[in-house]
Design a protein with these regions (language model features):
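ABC-family P-loop ATPase nucleotide-binding domain
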Residues: 1-14, 251-260
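ABC transporter nucleotide-binding domains
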Residues: 5-8, 15-191, 196-197, 201-210, ...
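Short, polar/charged, Gly/Pro-enriched helix-capping and turn/loop motifs at alpha-helix termini
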Residues: 92, 189, 230, 255-259
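Conserved NTP-handling cores and scaffolds of large molecular machines
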Residues: 108, 227, 231, 252-253
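Conserved beta-strand-loop-alpha-helix hinge in the C-terminal portion
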Residues: 213-237, 241
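Residue-level signature of catalytic and energy-coupling elements of molecular machines
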Residues: 245
Length: 260
């Protein structure tokens, strides 16, 4: 890929906390305008990677380039070109949806904050609830507002760190639809999740993080080719991402144990 087609480039990324190694030479690329899912169990280092890429945490060694800017050398430029939404919605429940958005637009010194807010409310299907306090919103609505707030200023790249944590099925589907729309409009989406069906539904490319390393990085279609379909009552049943994940992680565990 050409440099302007790559939103994120990571090579040999390492990070330790005291005597605990979290990342052991992680490397991957994310194509501009795509949805990239980083998949892994709790505690595997997904959030650590997000914190490094968003300049919230310094890595020990390796390189990380986001939107053409090295995260260590040009952190301010990185921050100006990205948005980050954490695992829990960071909204002010006392304010209305519109007031939350206007507040962020003013903090970012944008022209016509009210128009910015109205445009985002419409884009995220929140116009009818614009003047209600956020405390009355459903989980899915809060998450949509949270992501809308992170996009004030038209970021080229958004990091969604486990965006559907704590949401009911309806709320998760709301967020999935919105993520697809973001990518469709040209925004690059970096998604971390422990929900296999989420990655299966959304991602153009899936990387599996296990014990501090990326053990596989490919499209879902290519991952499925690693495992032949099973025949169930004369019908071919394609493997699910859950089956692929468990098989790959299981094989890696066997290999690691064999080397001990």
């Amino acid at each position: 890929m050409l440099p302007n087609e790559i939103a994120i480039s990571v090579q040999g990324l390492k990070k330790s906390y005291k005597n605990v190694t979290v990342l052991e030479g992680v490397g991957f690329e994310v194509k501009t305008g795509s949805i990239f899912a980083l998949l892994g169990s709790n505690g595997t280092g997904k959030t650590t990677i997000v914190k490094i890429l968003t300049t919230l945490l310094k890595h020990d060694s390796g390189t990380a380039v986001v939107n053409g800017f090295d995260v260590a050398a040009k952190p301010d430029s990185v921050r100006q070109s990205i948005s980050l939404t954490g695992q829990f919605a960071a909204v002010d429940e006392i304010l209305t949806g519109r007031e939350n958005l206007i507040m962020i637009a003013r903090l970012r010194h944008l022209d016509n904050p009210r128009q910015v807010a109205d445009d985002l409310l419409k884009r995220f299907g929140l116009t009818d609830a614009a003047d209600r306090r956020v405390s009355t919103y459903s989980g899915g609505m809060r998450r949509r507002l949270d992501i809308a707030m992170s996009l004030v200023g038209e970021s080229q790249l958004i990091f969604l760190d486990e965006p559907t944590t704590g949401l009911d099925p309806e709320g998760r589907i709301e967020v999935w639809k919105m993520v697809k729309e973001l990518a469709g409009s040209g925004t690059t989406v970096f998604l971390t999740t422990q929900y296999l069906d989420e990655a299966e539904q959304l991602a153009d490319r899936i990387a599996i993080l296990h014990k501090g390393r990326i053990i596989v990085n490919d499209t879902l279609a290519e991952l499925k080719k690693l495992f032949p379909p099973a025949k169930v009552e004369y019908i071919e049943k394609q493997p699910t991402l859950e089956e692929i994940f468990l098989a790959i992680v299981g094989k890696k565990e066997e290999k690691d144990n064999g080397n001990d």
